[in-house]
């Protein structure tokens, strides 16, 4: 890759200091003063870069690696050439995340779209809105009547903050996002194009065969340290609240229906759909393209495999997969049995396809 001007190199941190900051042990103390300026993948890392390895699959890439250090565990350290210093840790993935945050802190939240700071010309701030000192609003953003925004928060170009919305401190509302009927905590990141607080999908049968819209008069509550991906949609509650718990991370293109309650520190991957009034416990992980039926409960610490369909409650701590989702051991056993029967049937037909 040519020089990446989107994320310029760090001015430099001592390798020894980096090791201390990420909780790793440096294999060669003689290089502790070497400066580290950035992160890079193994195959193109150069002097001044730090990279990481989680498996032996990258072994061949070590031949071209010129990194100043590799973050890895003991099992991987045994295959790293002696010319490359090792930052030894039991949790290399976590250590690399910490290193990246130190070296490229500006990449932890969406970047500024203009060089302007403060309230930019072209932004519309309703006279009744209240903004603490240090709020930044980019051109073409709209802040509605009675909205309140905490210090250190950035409202990017084209974002819309609806009337009476509350946004805490040190948040980022990215370009083109819209926030309506919502209370948002501190250190929340909303990525471009996300839609928060629009009305949920609720209709009743009409007297003449049509559909009558059910009013949605609830709110969305997003707690501290939540991150919501681009083009994700979170509907407000019908009469209650839709809640996203503290520290939860939601990928791009996720749909969260009205009255859903998601616990703390969950991870929800792209294209997941969660229907209205579902309950998601703390620490739940949901793989990409999974669907969660309305009014179901997923217990604390449960894991849902990608492309699964959750039609009924999932107990705490369980791993479920398949359609309909069931205990992973049962699902995998069924898949293996179907594959075996298919193979036997194919052999009986002399290897000929139907």
Swiss-Prot record:
SUPFAM superfamilies: Trimeric LpxA-like enzymes. It is an enzyme of class 2 (transferase). GO terms for cellular component: membrane. Its EC number is 2.3.1.191. Belongs to the transferase hexapeptide repeat family. LpxD subfamily. It comes from Sinorhizobium fredii (strain NBRC 101917 / NGR234). It catalyses: a UDP-3-O-[(3R)-3-hydroxyacyl]-alpha-D-glucosamine + a (3R)-hydroxyacyl-[ACP] = a UDP-2-N,3-O-bis[(3R)-3-hydroxyacyl]-alpha-D-glucosamine + holo-[ACP] + H(+). Keywords: Acyltransferase, Lipid A biosynthesis, Lipid biosynthesis, Lipid metabolism, Repeat, Transferase. The active site is at 258 (proton acceptor). This is UDP-3-O-acylglucosamine N-acyltransferase. The keyword Repeat applies. The lineage of its organism: Bacteria, Pseudomonadati, Pseudomonadota, Alphaproteobacteria, Hyphomicrobiales. CDD domains: LbH_LpxD (cd03352).
């Amino acid at each position: 890759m040519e020089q990446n001007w989107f994320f310029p190199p760090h001015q430099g941190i001592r390798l020894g200091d980096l090791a201390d900051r990420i909780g790793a042990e440096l294999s060669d103390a003689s290089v502790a003063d070497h400066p580290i300026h950035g992160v890079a993948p193994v195959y193109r890392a150069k002097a001044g870069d730090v990279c990481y390895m989680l498996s032996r699959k990258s072994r061949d890439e070590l031949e071209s690696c010129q990194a100043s250090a590799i973050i890895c565990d003991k099992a991987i350290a045994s295959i790293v050439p002696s010319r490359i210093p090792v930052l030894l840790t039991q949790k290399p993935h976590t250590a690399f995340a910490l290193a990246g945050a130190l070296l490229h802190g500006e990449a932890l939240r969406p970047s500024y779209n203009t060089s302007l700071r403060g309230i930019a010309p072209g932004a519309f701030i309703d006279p009744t809105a209240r903004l603490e000192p240090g709020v930044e609003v980019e051109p073409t953003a709209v802040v509605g009547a009675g909205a309140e925004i905490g210090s250190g928060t950035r409202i990017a170009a084209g974002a819309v903050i609806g009337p009476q919305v509350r946004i805490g401190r040190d948040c980022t509302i990215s370009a083109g996002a819209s926030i309506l009927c919502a209370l948002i905590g501190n250190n929340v990141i909303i990525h471009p194009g996300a839609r928060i607080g629009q009305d949920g999908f609720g209709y009743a049968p009409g007297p003449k065969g049509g559909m009558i819209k059910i009013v949605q008069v609830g709110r969305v509550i997003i707690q501290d340290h939540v991150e919501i991906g681009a083009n994700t949609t979170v509907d407000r509650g019908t009469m209650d609240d839709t809640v996203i718990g503290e520290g939860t991370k939601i990928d791009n293109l996720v749909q969260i229906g009205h009255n859903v309650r998601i616990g703390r520190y969950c991870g929800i991957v792209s294209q997941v759909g969660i229907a209205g009034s579902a309950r998601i416990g703390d620490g739940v992980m949901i793989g990409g393209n999974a669907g969660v039926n309305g009014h179901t409960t997923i217990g604390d610490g449960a894991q849902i495999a990608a492309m699964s369909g959750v039609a009924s409650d999932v107990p705490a701590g369980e791993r479920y997969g398949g359609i309909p989702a069931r205990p992973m051991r049962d699902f995998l056993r069924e898949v293996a049995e179907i594959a075996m029967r298919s193979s036997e049937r194919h052999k009986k037909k002399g290897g000929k396809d139907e």
